[in-house]
């Protein structure tokens, strides 16, 4: 939107939210709002022209809404992202202008690309982490095994883990590029730089990033399944029939059919095996912190999960 609010005002943000809060009510498709950004989206099919018409009708409705409330859209900044290889890539217009098609778009800090492989997002995260790691090395002449982990976990690792439940690298090259940042960081402590990566992690009490992504998947699954986040679990999982095996938990989920690698590595598919293999006492934890403690304890007893390296 072209409209804005004075920087630093107290009531400005609240008033702006009030002004745009009813925008989603004028459309029939899904519409998500964040500050002055709006996303309109829906599933489309090659032979379903109704979906094309539906999107255009909604765009026209938004334009009419903006004119009514004198909150004009900045059409030059409005883009169209078509996701999927079979997407018909229909053209849409706003105020008589054809919206520009893009291959990627940043959404809340995560670069979403048209094929959902997230190569650009991975490269962006690695670049930010590299810059942060470089600043640490320039700012501190000597780093010990206490200081480095603290700085790394505070300033570098967040860049590599922000939103990774969505974009977590599943291609070998991307995964190696992400892990390489931590490899370089752990060499910053004198006396252990010549040790193997696995041994450096043990000395610094750091898990591998791959292990943290796997653990993070389980934590998010737990939150969704148990209703600890404002997400409908039916949008993510199909629950399997009740299990009668002793020790089996009641929240087992079915694994959706996935042919393509991208689909196999989406969150709702990749978490199924790990989640279903968790014991009942872990899944039925009362709080998120209790779940974290129990899954760490459980995985620590399993040979395939015991080492986070």
Named regions from a protein language model:
Residues 1-15, 41-48, 99-101, 114-115, ...:
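Short, conserved non-catalytic motifs in the polymerase core
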Residues 8, 12, 23, 36-38, ...:
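Mobile genetic element proteins and their domesticated derivatives, centered on retroelements
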Residues 13-42:
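Active-site palm subdomain of RNA-directed nucleic acid polymerases
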Residues 47, 57, 71-105:
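Short, conserved micro-motifs composed of acidic
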Residues 102-165:
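Basic, alpha-helical interaction scaffolds
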Residues 173-309:
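Short linear motifs embedded in intrinsically disordered, charge-biased segments
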